[in-house]
Amino acid sequence: MADTIFSSGNDQWVCPNDRQLALRAKLQTGWSVHTYQTEKQRRSQCLSPGELEIILQVIQRAERLDILEQQRIGRLVERLETMQRNVMGNGLSQCLLCGEVLGFLGSSSVFCKDCRKKVCTKCGIEASPGQKRPLWLCKICSEQREVWKRSGAWFYKGLPKYILPLKTPGRADDPHFRPLPVEPTETQPPSAETSRVYTWARGRVVSSDSDSDSDLSSSSLEDRPLPSGVKGTKGDKPRGDSGASMESPRLGPARPPSHLSGSQSSLGSEAGTGATEPQGGTPAQPEPRVPGKRHTWATPRY
């Protein structure tokens, strides 16, 4: 029984005998449930990785909450400092906050209990309306009391640790308002319709400088490709700079050289008068087309 109670076993919950207690007293090691442990028992009492992970998560969550609390107090302090920077009056003859003139000719004023400054009734807050003598506070002092109340500074006798909010940069540096990059458009090769329109327009420009409508038909005939096997009668004839009409095709024997000694203006006038028909007459019937010949369609001038 005594051996069971005062045994020198390895059980940490059993008190050792007097001999071992005296020996431990001399060695200044003492005895407790923690010191009287074997290495095996110490290893069995180590925390598992899951328990360590849970403890670390609790510590990290507490740190995040602490940072959020510091940021909340920092926003309150920033708001109070902004109000203190925006004062416009001197607090004597003017309202401390809005700068309005006080006195008989101005607005009625109240006296702040904390800062001992005068403010108008719009910038003042009545702190104790139930008392016989009302207690007025300016908005700055009222905000300061609110900061001390909501941050716990009244308990710690001072503001706790806080983090001021960061200054927001300008909106020009914001990536959502940056203009989107414009992609270069692919150039398409000109189609056949575009080239046909350009040829038609070129023919119209050439024909607009002529003196008669017969030049339109001659210029369009020159632009058309001739069929294979047919020899063109175009030749190397020079075209007039002033856009005069081309020489009519030769249907008969060649004219004598004396007929070509006239000026280009006389040729243009003769061609114009020859192309027009007398009023009241019937229009000339078109002749059948013959390969190698040109037909000039004349319209009456008005």
Swiss-Prot record:
GO MF annotation list: LIM domain binding; small GTPase binding; zinc ion binding
Expression tissues: Highly expressed in pancreatic islets. High to moderate expression in adrenal gland, pituitary gland and ovary.
Any single GO BP term: negative regulation of G protein-coupled receptor signaling pathway
Location relative to the cell: Cytoplasm; Cytoplasmic vesicle, Secretory vesicle membrane
Zinc finger annotations (FYVE-type) as residue ranges: 89-146
GO CC term (a single one): secretory granule
Residues the entry annotates as binding Zn(2+) 1: 95, 98, 120, 123
Statement: the UniProt record of this protein carries the keyword Membrane: yes
Pfam families in the record: FYVE_2
Biased composition (Low complexity): 258-269
Residues bound to Zn(2+) 2: 112, 115, 138, 141
Domain RabBD: 41-158
PANTHER family (alphabetical): RAB EFFECTOR NOC2 (PTHR45729:SF4), RABPHILIN, ISOFORM A (PTHR45729)
Domain notes: The N-terminus of the RabBD domain is necessary and sufficient for interaction with RAB27A.
Subunit structure: Recruited to dense-core vesicles through specific interaction with RAB27A in endocrine cells. Interacts with RAB3A, RAB3B, RAB3C and RAB3D. Interacts with ZYX.
Annotated protein name in UniProt: Rab effector Noc2
Species annotation: Mus musculus (Mouse)
Gene for this chain: Rph3al
